[in-house]
Amino acid sequence: MNNVRKIKGGSNLKGKIKVPGDKSISHRALIIGSIAQGETTIEGFLHSEDPLSTADCLRKLGVNIPDIKEDEPFTISGLGLDGIKEPKEILNCGNSGTTMRLLMGLLAGQEGKNFILTGDTSLNERPMGRVNKPLSLMGGIISGRESGNKAPISIYGNKLKGCVIGTPIASAQVKSAILLAGLKASGTTSVIEPASSRDHTERMLKAFGANISIRGELGRNVVIKSGGNLIGQRILIPGDISSASFWMIAASIVPNSEVLIKNVGLNPTRTGILNVMDSMGCNYEILDKSTIAGEPIGSIKVKTANNLRSFTIEGDILPKLIDEIPILTVAACFCNGVSEIKDAQELRFKETDRLKVMARQLSKFGAEITEKEDGLIINGQSKFHSAEVDSETDHRVSMSLAIASLVAKGTSKIMRADASYVSYPSFWEDLAKLTN
């Protein structure tokens, strides 16, 4: 790995690329395939640190997962809902909050078995009480530091009971943990969210044969009934729109650019960035639309747009673009007028405090950003100069700073740049390809 990257501003972007497989779907394909009966074949898997942490933990639980090669399909032999083994060692989730939170739900109902989950220094400071609390309502026996809010987390598998759970925030990780626990709970489990969050878990569980339904027009009430078995499937994972977003914004703000991003997942619970790009007046089109395994996909063609408009992000759209806030903060710096991000306090509990980190790092380029408790106010029409900036070990910050460097005058230096490997191992190669 190269932890310092130099980027010269002024290069336009031209060409077509295929971004890595969707991170959210990669995690879920592994987990659901592991508790299905029979074989599940996975193609398009994201070969990066976080999903590989999930694979490693599942192997320790007795799942037969082969050595995963980049860009190669592989097959899992599922254990069924009752086949999870008590591990002989601690389950290390690395830096992956998705791994830890979804496994909490998966393991809470494995009766009579003991599990310990831990992670790296960053993950062990992230809040787990939001998952622990609803699982405890179902009968889960879970403990950890700070009254079960911080890892290491200890789980003693217990008999769970279905119930109705209202979540205070719209979180796909919390919802998914409850639904996975619901597979082993007696009766019916219902999750009601304040806003709809990404629904990859629901789609995949349905494809595997789970008795799951969505109630209400807004998709905020998900109901799962226990009983029955999951059956192994063939899963084709589309490109990750969160990874594509860096090129979508780069092509919009870097002069004389045109980029085609092929086979991107267009799940409507993930496409909030397209709504914001519409508000900005970005020049893009979606081509080759289709549906694979219940997930809509398409290719996104983006050209440079002039006189981009400022925007406001708030309310129910946040869960649909929560991972895109760092790169949209960069975009806001080049819009006419003042943009504002509200209701985004959840970003303070990601790999870093992304609100604070993006304000701090972009200001080094000359951005005018005011940090608020729940968001940011960004003055547009910035003139970026070169700077030495730092990802602060956050993968999405690293890639956002790389795009910001393209529109800065001079050569910028990004420290700890290869944090990007967490979700996009080929990011720097793709950047070189598009700027050559």
Swiss-Prot record:
What pathway is it annotated to? Metabolic intermediate biosynthesis; chorismate biosynthesis; chorismate from D-erythrose 4-phosphate and phosphoenolpyruvate: step 6/7
Q: What is this protein called?
A: 3-phosphoshikimate 1-carboxyvinyltransferase
Tell me where on the tree of life, at the top rank, the source sits. Bacteria
**Gene Ontology molecular-function annotations:** 3-phosphoshikimate 1-carboxyvinyltransferase activity
Gene encoding the protein: aroA
Gene Ontology cellular-component terms for this entry are: cytoplasm
Supply the alphabetized keyword list. Answer: Amino-acid biosynthesis, Aromatic amino acid biosynthesis, Cytoplasm, Transferase
GO BP, sorted A to Z: amino acid biosynthetic process; aromatic amino acid family biosynthetic process; chorismate biosynthetic process
